[in-house]
Amino acid sequence: MKGSLIVITFFIAGIVAGYFDIIPRLTEMAGYSIYVLYLLIAIIGFEFGYKNLIPTIKKLDLTSFMLPLFTMGGTLIFTALAWLLLHSYPLHDYLAIGGAAGYYSLSSVLIMEYKKASAGLGIAAELGTIALLSNMIREIISLTCAPVFRKYFGWYALIASAGVASIDVVLPVIVRNCGPGAVPVAIVQGVILEILVPVTIMLFCSL
């Protein structure tokens, strides 16, 4: 929760600074955001190697590896259903937002970066904001409703609801509600989704 509040604070601070032109030179540096994203992806790879997760992964069954794929697939299906109700933007834009799978910090910037050329800065900013808020709400729901998910749907459902956050913010809640045995599955889901999310977003943003 603290991490989410920090992200919101910095996001609002950025809006205020940009609107009032408080730091003019930042507009010249906007194009460098994509390189920051590349660095973030490299750090994910470093974390994977540093924590030596390979032995843990080898002990898991096929279901554990399929979970992140079902998580992403289910997210995209329900995102498409939301599009049928709302129709505010094209379907592929909705799918780009849903394809973030809870990765709000990356998705908001990535969507803005890839949509501003085709849709304009205004629409790109709107989509980035929606991605930030909707995926942040997903994380909050996972944190607050964890006991309900665990009790009525099982611990796979709880891990799936967390999306990418199953590897960090929601992990303590998963352990508390599901026990230590759920940790390897949660970590594998987080790692696989961290790899899938940038690819999924770029795919739908290019349509």
What do these predicted ranges mean?
Residues 2-6, 33-34, 58-70, 93-100, ...:
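Cytoplasmic-side transmembrane-helix entry/capping segments in multi-pass membrane proteins
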Residues 52-80, 127-140, 185-193:
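Entry/N-cap segments of selected transmembrane alpha helices
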Residues 178-207:
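Long hydrophobic alpha-helical segments typical of transmembrane helices together
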